A protein has these predicted regions:
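Beta-lactamase-like hydrolase cores
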Residues: 1-39, 101-109
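Second-shell loop/turn segments in exported
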Residues: 33-42, 83-93, 102, 142-148, ...
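Short, well-structured active-site flanking segments
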Residues: 56-71, 168-176
Length: 248
């Protein structure tokens, strides 16, 4: 108690707002209070609440998943159909994962795609900023399909396929669809029923939570928050869904 008294009476309190409550769970009572009723912005302390709820509701073996699927059929080395990149809001998806997606396509013997490449972003709502953030804050883009924290997945995937010798031809055109490189989100569509899996990439809840808590990473925290929302079965998942899980 003396140490806490020293803290609240220190010089830092002259230029800061301090509110403390130490609560004894066994005795079900507060054992130290200082400005405990003062309204303050919770800031990154809420990441701890999100982490606890995620471990409780999702479990320690939960994995963040990104899928690569296709429709149609493969004849020879030509895919007559579309490819769907299905986002699960994995903030750790990086170049290595993208290369694995390209390798998955090549491993199936595909060297030509007679169709389109779509981003399935239906896992969550279209809100690009987290609730409570101002438009001019330095915030991450909350897209469920990111690569290297950026919302340019389809552009980079299509470019990588072309770099590896895969020809992409718009099924409605005789021209190679190099326009994929600058679609800026135009090729967004929910995958239909009956798609076939090419490959999937995973990252564990532990991997995401480590950066979320140790580095107080807002993108990782928002991603964890939306995993809770998606666990309700809502599609698209919303912040309201996540709050309901945490408050339950």
């Amino acid at each position: 108690v003396a140490t806490l008294d020293d803290l609240v009476k220190s010089d830092i309190s002259q230029t800061s707002q301090i509110g403390l409550m130490v609560y004894d769970l066994d005795a079900d009572s507060a054992i130290y209070c200082h400005n405990e009723l003062q309204t303050m912005r919770p800031a990154s302390t809420m990441k701890v609440i999100t982490a606890i709820a995620a471990l409780d509701k999702l479990g320690g073996s939960y994995q963040f998943k990104t899928d690569l699927c296709y429709t149609g059929e493969i004849k020879g080395h030509v895919l007559h159909g579309d490819i769907y990149c299905v986002g699960g809001f994995d903030p750790k998806f990086n170049v290595d994962d993208l290369n694995a997606f390209v390798e998955g396509v090549r491993r199936m013997g595909i060297d030509t795609i007679m169709g389109n490449i779509y981003a399935d972003k239906s896992m969550k709502d279209t809100a690009r900023l987290g609730e409570g953030w101002c438009w001019d804050d330095d915030n991450p883009c909350l897209s469920p399909l990111l690569i290297g924290r950026k919302d340019n997945f389809i552009d980079r995937f299509a470019q990588k396929l072309v770099d590896e010798g895969v020809v992409i031809i718009d099924k409605d055109s005789v021209n190679c669809a190099f326009r994929f490189m600058n679609t800026h989100g135009n090729f967004v569509r929910r995958k239909p029923q009956g798609t076939y899996s090419i490959t999937s990439r995973f990252h564990t809840i532990e991997q995401v939570m480590m950066k979320m808590l140790k580095e107080s990473d807002n993108l990782y925290a928002e991603s964890m928050f939306y995993q809770l929302a998606a666990s309700t079965g809502a599609r698209p998942a919303t912040a309201k869904n996540a709050r309901a899980v945490i408050n339950h």
